[in-house]
A protein has these predicted regions:
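Conserved SDR Rossmann-fold cofactor-binding beta-strand/turn motif
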Residues: 12-13, 66-72
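A short C-terminal helix-loop "cap" of Rossmann-like NAD(P)-dependent dehydrogenase/epimerase domains
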Residues: 27-35, 59, 73-93, 142-148
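Active-site Tyr-X1-5-Lys
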Residues: 37-65
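Conserved N-terminal glycine/acidic-rich loop preference
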Residues: 42-49, 77, 84, 162
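Alpha-helical substrate-binding/gating segment
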Residues: 73-90, 95-122
Length: 181
């Protein structure tokens, strides 16, 4: 801040949403309106980073800090293991079957820098799909039957809502395990 930096994009985490979901989330898809529920030391640190960002922008009205709550970051080399997730969907229940291709994560950082406004905002950053072939509605019915769905789920859509990032940042995932030959 002393160096005159006015735009900051920080790597936050999906873990603020309650991962590993030993306690059911109250609704799905999860979004930024869901209050932080850190369940690990790592998540507590990410929560404190976001709280610090809120204080910094309060002290400096021209400062822009964006917290990108990245899902589990993957590279194309990781996609070879994804078919095994479909054989055992419970193995990825811990983060609602979410992921983010590292290249799309980079796109989100660029979009956040380009669209920065004074203040602090958070965005869930995930791919548009899940890591398994099982439809998302079926995953929720099987593994989280008591969790309210805020809307009808289609196909393998992500259960970590990226709607705010799409709307405000122009973020749209371009890479993913289904597109990799």
């Amino acid at each position: 801040i002393r160096a005159g930096i006015r735009r900051i994009v920080m790597a936050s985490s999906e873990t603020l949403l309650g991962i590993p979901f030993d306690i059911d989330p109250p609704y799905a898809p999860l979004d930024e309106e869901y209050p932080s529920r850190p369940e690990s030391t790592y998540a507590i640190v990410k929560h404190l980073e976001e709280e610090l960002a809120r204080k910094l922008v309060r002290w400096d009205a021209e400062l822009s800090i964006t917290g990108l709550r990245f899902s589990n970051v993957m590279t194309p080399d990781d996609y070879a293991q994804f078919p095994d997730y479909s054989k055992n969907p419970s193995s990825r229940r811990w983060n609602l079957w979410g992921y983010i291709d590292a290249r799309d994560g980079a796109q989100a950082v660029l979009r956040a820098l380009e669209t920065a406004k004074p203040g602090f905002e958070t965005y869930v950053i995930a791919n548009a799909d899940t890591v398994v072939d099982t439809p998302s509605a079926e995953l929720m019915a099987t593994f989280f039957p008591d969790v309210e769905l805020t809307r009808e789920l289609t196909g393998n859509e992500t259960l970590l809502s990226i709607e705010k990032a799409r709307r405000e940042l122009g973020y749209e995932p371009k890479f993913g395990w289904r597109q990799t030959p």
